[in-house]
């Protein structure tokens, strides 16, 4: 039986969030068209600055200026792939950390091949559900589009292997999130099923992961903090919301009101 990793300590999350609020990073988000507004609002609520620059020549230029880059392949096409490759090349040249969200990898051939081709481009972090992480690592998965039929703990060995092979911190998210650098693991519980009834919460989490990758220090802790921030605020929002329609504003309010001591 696969042993469950230790729970990520609240004190470490609080310290990371304190540092994040001091830094207020600029995040270049090449994300999918469905989730841009929620992604931008989540980053703004946390105190970060989002930008979505998609023209290939500008994407490269802006990635050199940003503190972190997000690559989300949810609405991938040839033009967007060109922008992503240009942004990644520029980010790597500038030493800017970039995060991959491999949306629906494993179910569709074009995006699967594209995402796998990016693994050699030194991502700082990879965030996906169990099916996406298993497929990206080369294992059989049972996802359907952006949904996962696999358990996050069952995907942890694949996440570890993916982390070792890519050099990235890998977050496999679900009812419990597991974060690994291939050698060390953290578990982050929390959140609520209501988060799965609103489009874009997972994609927004990937943007928050990218933002926390801009911080110095232990990247494993930084990515785990991103997961803890989102799960905690999801819980807080659910207490105030009557359903999906009222969840989103409550979630943004919870992110805006979040204090480091709330994560203790």
From Swiss-Prot:
EC numbers: 2.7.1.50
Keyword Transferase: yes
Cofactor(s) needed for function: Mg(2+)
Stored Pfam families: HK
InterPro entries linked to this entry: Hyethyz_kinase, Ribokinase-like
Cysteines paired by S-S bonds: none
Catalytic activity, as annotated: 5-(2-hydroxyethyl)-4-methylthiazole + ATP = 4-methyl-5-(2-phosphooxyethyl)-thiazole + ADP + H(+)
GO MF, one annotated term: magnesium ion binding
Binding-site positions, substrate: 52, 200
Protein's pathway: Cofactor biosynthesis; thiamine diphosphate biosynthesis; 4-methyl-5-(2-phosphoethyl)-thiazole from 5-(2-hydroxyethyl)-4-methylthiazole: step 1/1
EC category name: transferase
Alphabetical keyword list: ATP-binding, Kinase, Magnesium, Metal-binding, Nucleotide-binding, Thiamine biosynthesis, Transferase
Gene Ontology biological process terms, A to Z: thiamine biosynthetic process; thiamine diphosphate biosynthetic process
Residues involved in ATP binding: 127, 173
Function of the molecule: Catalyzes the phosphorylation of the hydroxyl group of 4-methyl-5-beta-hydroxyethylthiazole (THZ).
Family classification: Belongs to the Thz kinase family.
Protein name, as recorded: Hydroxyethylthiazole kinase
Annotated organism of origin: Serratia proteamaculans (strain 568)
Biological classification of the source: Bacteria, Pseudomonadati, Pseudomonadota, Gammaproteobacteria, Enterobacterales
Gene assigned in the entry: thiM
């Amino acid at each position: 039986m696969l042993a469950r990793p230790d729970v990520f300590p609240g004190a470490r999350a609080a310290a990371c969030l304190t540092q994040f609020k001091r830094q207020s990073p600029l995040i270049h988000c090449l994300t999918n068209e469905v989730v841009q507004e929620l992604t931008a609002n989540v980053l703004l609520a946390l105190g970060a600055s989002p930008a979505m620059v998609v023209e290939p020549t500008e994407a490269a230029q802006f990635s050199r200026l940003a503190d972190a880059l997000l690559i989300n392949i949810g609405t991938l096409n040839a033009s967007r792939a060109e922008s992503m490759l240009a942004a990644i090349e520029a980010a790597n040249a500038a030493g800017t950390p970039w995060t991959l969200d491999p949306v629906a990898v494993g179910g569709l051939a074009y995006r699967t091949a594209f995402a796998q081709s990016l693994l050699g481009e030194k991502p700082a972090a990879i965030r996906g559900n169990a099916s996406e992480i298993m497929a990206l690592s080369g294992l059989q998965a049972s996802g359907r589009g952006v949904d996962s039929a696999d358990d996050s703990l069952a995907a942890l060995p694949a996440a570890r292997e993916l982390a070792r092979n890519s050099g990235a911190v890998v977050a496999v998210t679900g009812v419990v999130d597991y974060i690994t650098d291939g050698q060390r693991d953290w578990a982050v519980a929390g959140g609520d099923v209501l988060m799965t009834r609103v489009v874009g919460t997972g994609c927004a989490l990937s943007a928050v992961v990218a933002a926390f990758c801009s911080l110095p220090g232990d990247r494993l802790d930084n990515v785990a903090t991103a997961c803890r921030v989102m799960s905690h605020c999801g819980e807080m929002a659910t207490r105030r919301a009557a359903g999906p329609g009222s969840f989103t504003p409550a979630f943004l309010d919870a992110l805006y009101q979040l204090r480091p001591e709330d994560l203790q």
